[in-house]
Amino acid sequence: THYLTYQMLEGFLPRELIKTCRAPNGSSARYDALINGEVDATTLTEPYLSLAEKNGCRVIIEGMYHGTEVASDDVDAETYAAFNRAVKKAVQLINANKRKYMQYFIDRHKGQHPGIETLTVDDFRLSRLQMVDPAPIPEEELRRTYEWMRSWGMIEELSPDVLVDVHRQQVAHEVSAQ
């Protein structure tokens, strides 16, 4: 998620004006760091974004989830395809009535942070929740993202093909479409 934040900030600021710091891993810890004044701004995912807004924080920029899960080599194409079929079905159901499914989302996160217990469905901006079908990462997008990550020094010099098996990804998505 922090990669997306860097990319969005680059749309408004020259790279040399983007100041970063080491922040805790995970939205729960980053939310706490923000609320406790340890950082001035941070990247949050839901439900912590809505929790931050509920507690007076302001959203500066936001983006949406791509819709592709990355699997390890231990996951074969058929298993990945079955997973994608299930996700597609869930996307259809949730997009048909986001409000209906939000309580499941809240319940899933309860116990991870005491603030989550205070959230209700009305605390979420449902238009922010963009559920999209899983799809392969287009090769050009993968290459562009890889080059961009290298330019920030986020990854070592590897081939994008080492990071994502484009062929396996494509096969799995084709199988799930059947």
Each model region followed by its residue ranges:
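Ligand-binding cleft/hinge of the Venus flytrap
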Residues: 2-23, 106-107, 151
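A short alpha-helix capping/helix-coil boundary motif
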Residues: 9-11, 26-29, 81, 122-126
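Short aromatic/hydrophobic-glycine micro-motifs
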Residues: 14, 57-58, 154
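Mature, folded catalytic cores of secreted/periplasmic enzymes
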Residues: 16-17, 34, 117, 121-122
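Pocket-lining segment of extracytoplasmic ligand-binding domains
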Residues: 20-110
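Secondary-structure end/capping motifs
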Residues: 77-158
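Conserved C-terminal helix/tail region of periplasmic/extracytoplasmic solute-binding proteins
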Residues: 146-178
